[in-house]
Amino acid sequence: MSLIAAAIAIGLGALGAGIGNGLIVSRTVEGIARQPEAGKELRTLMFIGVALVEALPIIAVVIAFLAFFS
């Protein structure tokens, strides 16, 4: 049962991060296409947003390890 819980935690964490990263990057590309002069600021904010979204799978892996080893 703990294997299933670990797999679900990692899978949903990766799914959420993939969707979130895709949305962030697509909106950034749209913004840069509209205002090329704001590209540097948008790119910086994009990397901050992607880093925050990537925290989700890391937390999911920790939860999966806790479920697997407890």
From Swiss-Prot:
Against InterPro entries, the record matches this protein to:
ATP_synth_csu_bac/chlpt, ATP_synth_F0_csu, ATP_synth_F0_csu_DDCD_BS, ATP_synth_F0_csu_sf, ATPase_proteolipid_c-like_dom, F/V-ATP_Csub_sf
Which SUPFAM superfamilies does the record cross-reference, listed alphabetically?
F1F0 ATP synthase subunit C
Sorted alphabetically, which keywords does the UniProt record give? ATP synthesis, Cell membrane, CF(0), Hydrogen ion transport, Ion transport, Lipid-binding, Membrane, Transmembrane, Transmembrane helix, Transport
Do you know which PROSITE patterns this protein is assigned to?
ATPASE_C
Listed CDD domains = ATP-synt_Fo_c_ATPE
A matching Pfam family: ATP-synt_C
Task: Answer whether the UniProt record assigns the keyword Cell membrane to this protein.
Answer: yes
Q: Which GO terms describe its cellular component?
A: plasma membrane; proton-transporting ATP synthase complex; proton-transporting two-sector ATPase complex, proton-transporting domain
Which membrane topology term applies here? Multi-pass membrane protein
Q: Where are the transmembrane segments?
A: 4-24, 45-65
Q: Which Gene Ontology molecular function entries are recorded, alphabetically?
A: lipid binding; proton-transporting ATP synthase activity, rotational mechanism
The record's note on quaternary structure and interaction partners says:
F-type ATPases have 2 components, F(1) - the catalytic core - and F(0) - the membrane proton channel. F(1) has five subunits: alpha(3), beta(3), gamma(1), delta(1), epsilon(1). F(0) has three main subunits: a(1), b(2) and c(10-14). The alpha and beta chains form an alternating ring which encloses part of the gamma chain. F(1) is attached to F(0) by a central stalk formed by the gamma and epsilon chains, while a peripheral stalk is formed by the delta and b chains.
Alphabetized HAMAP family for the sequence: ATP_synth_c_bact
Q: Which family does it belong to?
A: Belongs to the ATPase C chain family.
This protein is called what? Answer: ATP synthase subunit c
Q: Which organism is it from?
A: Bacillus licheniformis (strain ATCC 14580 / DSM 13 / JCM 2505 / CCUG 7422 / NBRC 12200 / NCIMB 9375 / NCTC 10341 / NRRL NRS-1264 / Gibson 46)
